[in-house]
Amino acid sequence: MSKFDSIRVISFDLDDTLWPTMQTIVEAERQLFRWLEENTPELARQHSIESLRAHRRELALANPGIAHDMNLTRELHLRELFAGLGYDTALAGAAVEHFQQHRNRVFPYEDVRPVLERLREEFILVSVTNGTSEVEKTPLAGIFHHSFNAVDAGRAKPHPAIFELLIDRTGAVPREVLHVGDDPARDIAPAREL
């Protein structure tokens, strides 16, 4: 009997495992900046995509308790910048929503969907990500039985909270779960801790 015979659940990281990430994030940031140019022109004049990224990083470092929630961090950093320039801070929510629409426009690797469809016939499939992609709004909609992100878990990988959540929600025990990810430190190490 192989140790794989007991597998009931296969979990997958998303970004850079099932699809390339950088092209999507770069485009989402570009689309957000266009939105800022139209809705908060003075902010767009004073900043670049790079300076906005740096400001957001500073906010995340100063607030480690929310750093796992990238959209909240993005919204708070925009609220801060909007307030400083006299813009309605409520616009930040709309800006993040615009970013998220473009963040969900991912391009899975060619063989991903057919392989996942086949695996779905035999296993419970779960997506786990630190990212903000909403799987049901991507080309992989309808594939996963469960999808969890760092916000759901309250912590980002490599903390094992997301894997603990997976175990709790699927009713599986650790030896029944196989995790597939691209990052040994953020994906493989915390999955092994269980």
Language model features with spans:
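Glycine-rich phosphate-binding loop signature in dinucleotide/nucleotide-binding domains
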Residues: K3-D5, E121-E122, R169-E176
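Conserved Lys-Pro-Asp/Glu-containing loop-to-beta segment of HAD-superfamily phosphomonoesterases
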Residues: A156-A189
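N-terminal helical cap/lid subdomain that shapes the substrate entry/recognition surface
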Residues: K3-E110
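Substrate-recognition element of Asp-dependent hydrolases with the DxDx(T/V) motif
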Residues: A90-A150
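Short, acidic/turn-prone active-site loops that include or flank metal/cofactor-
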Residues: A150-A156
